[in-house]
């Protein structure tokens, strides 16, 4: 069993963060580089558009893999990539075409795998 941390020890620990810019910094501050974010909303409320813009921001800090489980590499996805000018982050953004979770896990285990993974959308 690991030793419990004192308050002083806990608050003095250095964490790697994302220095987000503009509206992203205004909304989320400087989040820790690791973690899980859930974006929820009703169908048609702009979740995929929001997440695509988030991917573009995350690409400033590393490589992003976007697993589009609903749209894949469809015309709709092509239009979304164009609308948000994702070509600007071409070398730091990968579109995964409906990659199953088992294969995604294998991808994550590979050497030099992307730094961030986005799954759109996860059925619960």
Where are each of the predicted segments found?
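Charged, amphipathic alpha-helical linker segments immediately N-terminal to NTP-binding catalytic cores
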Residues: 1-14
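Secondary-structure junction/capping motif
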Residues: 6, 100, 121-122
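Pre-Walker A adenine-sensing motif
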Residues: 15-31
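Conserved P-loop
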Residues: 33-103
């Amino acid at each position: 069993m690991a030793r419990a941390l004192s308050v002083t020890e806990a608050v003095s620990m250095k964490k790697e963060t994302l220095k987000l810019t503009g509206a992203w910094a205004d909304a989320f501050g400087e989040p820790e580089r690791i973690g899980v974010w859930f974006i929820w909303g009703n169908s048609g409320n702009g979740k995929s558009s929001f997440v695509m813009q988030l991917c573009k921001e995350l690409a400033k800090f590393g490589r992003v893999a976007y697993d589009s489980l609903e749209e894949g590499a469809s015309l709709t996805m092509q239009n979304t990539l164009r609308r948000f000018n994702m070509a600007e982050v071409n070398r730091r953004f990968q579109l995964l075409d409906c990659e199953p979770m088992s294969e995604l896990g294998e991808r994550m285990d590979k050497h030099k795998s992307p730094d961030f993974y986005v799954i759109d959308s996860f059925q619960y």
